[in-house]
Structure formats: C-alpha cells, structure tokens
Amino acid sequence: MGLGDKIRNTAEKASGKVKEATGKATDNEKLEAEGKTDQFKGNAKNTVENAKDTLRGN
C-alpha cells in the first residue's frame, strides 16, 4: 500500500468521524450516517490494501 493511499484512507476515516460527531451534536441523522459510511469505507479500503500487501509479501 502506498503512503498516499494510507493518507487518503486515514483522511476519509477522520472526515467521517467529524461528520458523525457533527451529526450527533446537531441531531442530523443523515450527516451522522454519512460519517459512519465514510469511516467504514476508509477502513474497508485499508483492509483491501493490507491484504494486497500481504499477498505481495510486503
């Protein structure tokens, strides 16, 4: 996994946490759900990239 991918995935997760917290604070269920989705996507992308690295022997 390239460093750029790690940074993008981590940024997506962080952005998701901010969205989720903002959604909770403002009682905005849609924003909260978007935040959870962004976090899930960031985690999923990291999992896929880590699996690729493992298969490549990195």
Curated annotation (Swiss-Prot):
One family name in Pfam for this protein: CsbD
Region (Disordered) residue spans: 1-58
Basic and acidic residues bias (residue ranges): 1-39
InterPro entries, alphabetized: CsbD, YjbJ_sf
The family this protein is said to belong to: Belongs to the UPF0337 (CsbD) family.
Full protein name: UPF0337 protein CE1672
Organism: Corynebacterium efficiens (strain DSM 44549 / YS-314 / AJ 12310 / JCM 11189 / NBRC 100395)
